[in-house]
């Protein structure tokens, strides 16, 4: 049992910290990490809400466990990303190297290999494993936003967290527009809007901290 509990919440931008075992953790915007100031000898247990990337120090005697509200991810030493925002229906775990397992009381333990991503949906309690390009899911920790056929609704959800803004769509059809691209997270938000608006028949209007998304026609 640890002597104290650390609690880090990042409202905007990104935050990097080192844990007592040498593990490094990166937190994305609107994310919270709770962790022991000093880990116990037999396990290293933390709790994540939001999105985090972890480079775990190897220790075969003490598994590293990430608790989320949908289950646990267990590792010994590896690099992986966990996205588990409470307002989203799916938790996503993406493995860069090593091995991780996902544990939930409703489904059998699922083990990931490098380059695989596990998706677990809140509603139907089903887990899916798929092969992915991990760069698309971990670029945020290097200040890159990488989108591949991503809906405008999901893109704006990410930007809203990063820039701490509200988003209002004129109609639901605009939410389903798809975009691909690679942008720096510290780009001025109006530059994002200009790039997205090119050839997409969509217009962005920024008023205070609210973005109104409308058809350009």
Model-derived regions, located:
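A residue-level detector for the "anchor" residue at the start of short, highly conserved motifs
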Residues: 3-217
């Amino acid at each position: 049992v640890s002597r104290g509990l650390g609690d880090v919440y990042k409202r905007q931008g990104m935050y990097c910290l080192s844990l007592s075992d040498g593990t490094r953790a990166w937190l994305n915007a609107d994310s919270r990490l709770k962790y022991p100031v000093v880990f116990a000898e037999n396990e290293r247990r933390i709790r994540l809400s939001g999105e985090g990337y972890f480079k775990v120090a190897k220790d075969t005697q003490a598994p590293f466990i990430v608790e989320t509200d949908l289950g646990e991810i267990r590792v010994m030493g590896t690099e992986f990303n966990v996205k588990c925002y409470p307002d989203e229906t799916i938790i996503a775990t993406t493995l860069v190297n090593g091995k991780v397992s996902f544990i939930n009381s409703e489904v059998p333990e699922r083990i990931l290999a490098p380059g695989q991503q596990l998706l677990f949906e809140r509603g139907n309690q089903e887990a899916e494993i798929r092969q992915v390009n991990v760069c698309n899911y971990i670029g945020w920790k290097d200040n890159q936003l990488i989108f591949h056929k991503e809906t405008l609704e999901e893109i704006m959800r990410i930007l809203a967290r990063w820039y701490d803004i509200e988003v209002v769509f004129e109609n639901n059809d605009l939410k389903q527009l798809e975009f691909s691209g690679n942008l720096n997270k510290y780009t001025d938000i109006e530059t994002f809007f200009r790039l997205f608006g090119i050839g997409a028949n969509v217009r962005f209007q920024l008023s205070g901290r609210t973005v109104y998304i409308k058809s350009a026609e």
